[in-house]
Curated annotation (Swiss-Prot):
Signal peptide boundaries: 1-24
Biological process, per Gene Ontology: actin filament polymerization; angiogenesis; antibacterial humoral response; antimicrobial humoral immune response mediated by antimicrobial peptide; cell migration; defense response to Gram-positive bacterium; hematopoietic stem cell proliferation; innate immune response
Pfam hit, one: RnaseA
Protein's recorded name: Angiogenin
Compartment(s) of residence: Secreted; Nucleus; Nucleus, Nucleolus; Cytoplasm, Stress granule
Disulfide linkage: C50-C105, C63-C116, C81-C131
Subunit and interaction comment: Homodimer. Interacts with RNH1; inhibiting ANG ribonuclease activity. Interacts with PCNA.
Enzyme Commission numbers on file: 3.1.27.-
Binding-site residues, tRNA: R45, D46, C105, V127
Organism the protein comes from: Pan troglodytes (Chimpanzee)
Cellular component terms per the entry's GO annotation: actin cytoskeleton; angiogenin-PRI complex; basement membrane; chromosome; cytoplasm; cytoplasmic stress granule; endocytic vesicle; extracellular space
Activity regulation details: Has weak tRNA ribonuclease activity by itself due to partial autoinhibition by its C-terminus, which folds into a short alpha-helix that partially occludes the substrate-binding site. In absence of stress, the ribonuclease activity is inhibited by RNH1 in the cytoplasm. In response to stress, dissociates from RNH1 in the cytoplasm and associates with cytoplasmic ribosomes with vacant A-sites: ribosomes directly activate the tRNA ribonuclease activity of ANG by refolding the C-terminal alpha-helix. In response to stress, the angiogenic activity of ANG is inhibited by RNH1 in the nucleus.
Keywords of this entry: Angiogenesis, Cytoplasm, Developmental protein, Differentiation, Disulfide bond, DNA-binding, Endonuclease, Hydrolase, Nuclease, Nucleus, Protein synthesis inhibitor, Pyrrolidone carboxylic acid, Secreted, Signal, Stress response
Length: 147
């Protein structure tokens, strides 16, 4: 009986040891996606916004050429990875059923080193993401909504 419990405990501990890195890796890729592409409530959406957020998010050493920020709530973005707010799109991607308010920051000027100067384009777009385990981990593109 005691030996059976020991084996069961060993299997349980080994199972715990194998599971967290996978979950942690999924969460770190999702967290990285949020850092690069999510800003719930932007303060302005012009070149000053782009220069400020790109610097705060660590995307300016060297200056990133282009980056899109999705505005709204995380639940709606996560729902793209499900049928609630997403449809299959090309190979292993999902496209949002609804459009999102987005700001695209594009590097303006010749130098790839700070101070980085950006131009902002704001609008409503459907977004295309790659998902892993039900979480968005890569923003592939954003598509302007047709009127």
């Amino acid at each position: 009986m005691v030996m059976g419990l020991g084996v069961l405990l060993l299997v349980f501990v080994l199972g715990l040891g194998l599971t967290p890195p996978t979950l942690a890796q999924d969460n770190s890729r999702y967290t990285h996606f949020l850092t690069q592409h999510y800003d719930a409530k932007p303060q302005g959406r012009d070149h000053r916004y782009c220069e400020s957020i790109m610097r705060r998010r660590g995307l300016t050493s060297p200056c990133k050429d282009i980056n899109t920020f999705i505005h709204g709530n995380k639940r709606s973005i996560k729902a793209i990875c499900e049928n609630k707010n997403g449809n299959p799109h090309r190979e292993n991607l999902r496209i949002s059923k609804s459009s999102f308010q987005v700001t695209t920051c594009k590097l303006h000027g010749g130098s790839p080193w700070p101070p980085c100067q950006y131009r902002a384009t704001a609008g409503f777009r459907n977004v295309v993401v790659a998902c892993e385990n039900g979480l968005p981990v890569h923003l592939d593109q954003s598509i302007f909504r047709r009127p």
